[in-house]
Structures are given as structure tokens and as C-alpha cells.
Amino acid sequence: MREPADVLSWTEDPRPDQGISFLGSDGWDFWSYQRLAESAGLMAGALAGSGVEPGDVVVAVLPSGPQFVVTFFGAMLAGATVSPVAPAAVWHQSGQYNAHLTRVLGVARPKKVVTEAKKVAQFSDAVTAAGSELVSYEDLLASGEPFRTEPAELALLQLTSGSSGNPKGVRVSRRALASNMRAIHHWLDLGDRPRSAHWMPFHHDMGLIGGLLMPAAHQADCWSLRPGDFVRDPLAYLRCFGEAGGAEIGTMPNFGLDQVIRRVTPDRLSGMDFSSWRSVVVGAERLDPVVFEQFTALLAPFGFERSALTPAYGLAEATLAVSGLTRRREPRYVRLDEEGRAVDTGGTPGALVGCGTPVEGVDVRVVDDDGNPVPEGTVGEIVVSGTSLADGYVSNVADSASLTAFAGAELKTGDAGLLLDGELFPVGRLGDSMKVRGRALFAEDLEVALRELGMPGHAVAVLLGSRGTEPVAVAVLEEVPEDMVARVTKLLAHLTAGVAIDVVRGPFRTIERTTSGKPRRRTMWQRYLAGELLPLDAGTPG
């Protein structure tokens, strides 16, 4: 099987016998690649007929499913740039979502916004205010004639806000997208039509490229679940791999592994065989070696091999993949000694997980505050360059990080990490750290420590910042017993050496998260400063 040449090459000769199976309320719904390509051609004709011209932006506000796939590829066939937006279902209050949609459309400035017919009334005001036109998927598909034209050079406007809450559009060219897809193909040694299963949402870079564009480029059978389906029943996802003729490749963030551990017991895996599960790519957030080992322990009796765990590092600004562990290599763990240098360790709490070497066409450096390379095994800022790099941002907010991230031909990621024997070990966000005893302490480090105290990983987030001139560490806890608060305060006081401690305890969904599950630390920090996240009277250690 040749490597993917272009994101649209599969539409020229689509296969009728292979495709994507989407999990719905009535079970699996199979769409062959031939059916998807034909529907995408009709969508392209409808978009072109409604006024979309080459180079225009089309925003897709659709759940992960066949409607999204048809709209995404249809917009590309019409010569448009596609910008996927998280659907309202991932937000908990419609008012918050409409405000978010207004901000997003102000960045993307689309010609058309495509959504489900049942959502048109809800989104109408936001789309009109942005000067765009809202159309339903159903109406478009009913009016289209087959059409295709030369695709736009700007393939994607990938919206991202990270922990800040301020949306930015990452400009991903066709060239960068094709380069990264080829790199992923070689890194994972995908071979001929590898079967895969995914649940990450299509509006997220990991779900879009790893869970849709890669399977489509290979015209490989794929099982696609929505994130809510996975959260409610992770066993449904595991069945995609454990039953005969099942998937070989999967992707998920660390919290996905944790969800499996918490929700699936060994007796429910009886009769499954995971020996064909070649790779589960794990990325999108700080990786936890304890979770890696627990996931392996759960599935190993049923044929899962530890070497199938494939830690990876990536970000939308580099299209997706930056580095990843190669096949059949087991994850490597290191910890930082008192001098801040990396030393090998086992899968102990707080250890860093190696995310492999840079993928083809990508170069990684780790530098100090002045941009000079740091010694091997020493923490600095991760800087990325290469053929997969995006062409910069589109943003309505002139924050300093966005203005300086793309410097020359390099990307300053804002992530801390280290290189050891050519392998990248991500540590955390530079903006989510503080100096303690002369060393950088990251919010992720404190969250790991609190999990070891007995806090579920999904129920804790740590915020670091300054209140005036006073450094503060804030622990945001969800649905935890009152007696846990004093233990959390005591541990944080010990780890942060006299930094002021506050604890916020609230119900489920107190912790704001991105659509990929990362805490929105900066957004919550602003709410804390504004008095919207009220701390308990837990005291302030001296």
C-alpha cells in the first residue's frame, strides 16, 4: 500500500467494500467510501451552487458522524478551506455555547456555516452577527449536483483555544497536511489498509487527522464512536479491538486510558482477544506511567502487549504529530533528580513518559529562555520546525504568545520538555508552572501528586499564578469528601514550600475543560481572580 498522497486522493476511486462504521442509537451504521465520496461530491456541488468560491472558509458545526465527513470532504472538493467547530453537545449551557460560537466565527470569518437542521434556529443569531450564512446539511445535500474543483492551498483552519479560552485559527496548508499524514504512515508502519477505531471528536486535531483523514486516505475499515458513547460505555470501544476481525490502530488521550481502567472490570473482557491491537497512540496531554501500567495490567491477560502503547507528542500548530514511539518499543520512563536532570526510573508516580523521536520531516530542539540549546536531559522549551508546520494563526486577540510562537521557520510551542538519547519527554505548559526552591514546578506535577493521595484524575485541576505579588496554588476539586480538603492543602503546602494555597470544592463540571479533556487553567484562573471560583477557608500556610 502506497503512502497517502493527498487528503482527497481517495475520492477519485473510492472503494464500495470498505468504509467507516458509525455507532448510533440503533447500532453500527456502515458507510462505504464510495457512498461517502458520492455524497461529498453532491455537497460540493450544493456549496458551489450556493455561492461558495475557491478559497472561502466553510465552518462545519456537526457532531462526529457521516454528516461531518460528507460536509468536510464536500467543502474541500468545492475548493473551500474547512474549519471544524465543536458542536453544542460538548458544552453544558447553550448560552455559553452561543457566545463561544460568536467568538469562533469572528476568527474564522466563514462564507457558510453548515449545521444540522434542528440546530439552525439556535445558531441563527450568532451566524448572522458574524456576517455569515447558516445552512443545514439536509437542505444542501438535497440540492446538490456532483462537483469538484482544484482544492484550496489552505486546507484547514483548525480552531484551538487550549487552556486560554481565546479561540485562534491554525492555518494548515495542503502541503503541511500531506507531509504530516505521510510521516504518521511511516512512523506507525501502517502498511496496507490498517483497521482502526476512534472516539476522539472530529473537530479536534487528533480525532480529525488520526481518526478520519488517515483511515480515509488508506480506504481502511474504521469504527467511529462519539466521545459521549466512549465515556458512557468504554467497553463498546474495546470490543472494536477484542472481537474477530477487529481494529488494529487506536488513538486517545491519557484520560481515555483512565476511563477504561475505572469503568471496565476483567470479567467484562471475557472472550476478547487483543493480540491484534498493534498500536494505541496516546497523546494530547501529560501522560501518566501509572495509568499506562494499570491499562496494560487490565488487558494483558486477554492478549494485549505492553509495546502496543504508543506515547506521542503533537499539536495543531504542527498539523498533528511531532514525535512518537516506534512500533514494538516499550515506553521509557524518567524522573528529574535534585539537579533537574533526567534519570531512568520505573513506572512510578510523577515519572515522565518518553514520546519517541521526531517523525519524518520534523525537527525538535529544546532551548533556554534565550533560545540556546540546553544540555541533554535538561528541561527547556520545546521548539519545532519542519515540513508539517502550520502557516501561523488567525486570531482576534493579539496575545504575546500568539505573536511570537511562529518565529522564522520554527514554532515556539510554550511546552516544556527534555531530550534524552534523541527521545522527547514533554513535561507541561510553561505558563502553568512556578519556581519553587529554584526549580520549575508544573501544575501537572501537582495533579499527579494529588492523584497519588487518592484523588481521581478527572476530579482535580491545579492552577498556578500570582495574586498581586503573592504566588498562589489553587486546587479545584470536584465531588470530593470534605475530609479530603485538609489532606490536599497539607500536601500542596509541602510541595510548594510556603506558596499560598487555596482549595475550591464544587460539584461535577466545576472544572472547565477543553473538548479534548484538558483543564482550561487560564480561564479558571481568571474566574478565580474575579471571585467566581470561591475557595474554601482552608487557610494559607506560611
Residue ranges and their predicted role:
Residues 2, 354-365, 370-377, 381-440:
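Conserved ATP-binding/catalytic segment of the ANL
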Residues 16-18, 143-159, 165-166, 180, ...:
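Conserved pre-ATP/AMP-binding loop-to-beta segment of ANL
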Residues 7-32, 154-157, 164, 314, ...:
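AMP-dependent adenylate-forming
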Residues 178-195, 203-248, 263:
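Conserved AMP-binding/adenylation subdomain of ANL enzymes
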Residues 242, 386, 391-392, 414-496:
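AMP-binding/adenylate-forming catalytic core of the ANL superfamily
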